[in-house]
Amino acid sequence: MIRKLHLGLACLLLSGGFALGQKLTADLPYVEGGHERQVLDVYVPESTKGRNLPVMFWIHGGGWQQGDKSDVHVKPKVLCDRGFVFVSTNYRLLPEVTMEEIVGDVAKSLAWVHREIAKYGGDPNRIFVGGHSAGAQLAALICTDDRYLKKEGVSLEVLKGCVPVDGDTYDIPKIIMTAEHRQAVYGGKMPTNGHRQKFGNDPKKHLHFSAVTHVAPGKKIPPFLILYFPGNPETRAQAHRLRTVLQAANIPAKAYGKADSNHGRLNHDLGKPDDPATKELFAFLDSLIEN
């Protein structure tokens, strides 16, 4: 069932503390007759009567095995304040479905947004994609491997920016090699629920699900802002790896590390006015909207 909620006095205006409202339409199915997790939420600024607002499409984390579209913290509030429509999607999870099907769900959800978001005041041709942790991998992949969206009849041209947050799987072969090298050097048990368990043992699939594999000039890949916690060597290395590959293909990309944080707090604090990563995010979005 689709739920409609009016969140009066829900958004704090960053410039002065005046509260704005937002309208949430929850649990919209993006696959007709689909799985209970093939649903998304749409947040719209209640006080804004304008149309063609830019859209932020958010993908939750949780190791591809858990998590929920409600894990957005203050992001919908502050982005509604800034004149965005905010969409948060669910997707089916491991081990019930394969990784290929998870990415396919994200593509189907994005295609729904492209088709339907104008009804909610959003611009179907100005969509930004972001996600945290596992959602960062999915965001980066969907913005670089155009096959998923092409299958749904959508071009990468409608994506105007990508904001992956603290992902460690933009280059899956490297993260697997890192974990196995560490185990060989320092000993201890290999993880029973690590990347090999999630992505399988086929090296071709490791490449297939790695965003860096698909980066190339001329594909209409959008600019990237890659946020990460520098205290984690894996996410730091992966952020810089993705940035380097993007820049080599002449795609605008910046990697920003927020030191006073951790994996969870980086996501939780994103959107707070005094947060350094938030300032980077707003500068990134503003520069692309103005262009």
Language-model-derived ranges and their functions:
Residues 6-17:
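Bacterial N-terminal signal peptides
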Residues 20-291:
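Alpha/beta-hydrolase superfamily serine-hydrolase fold, recognizing
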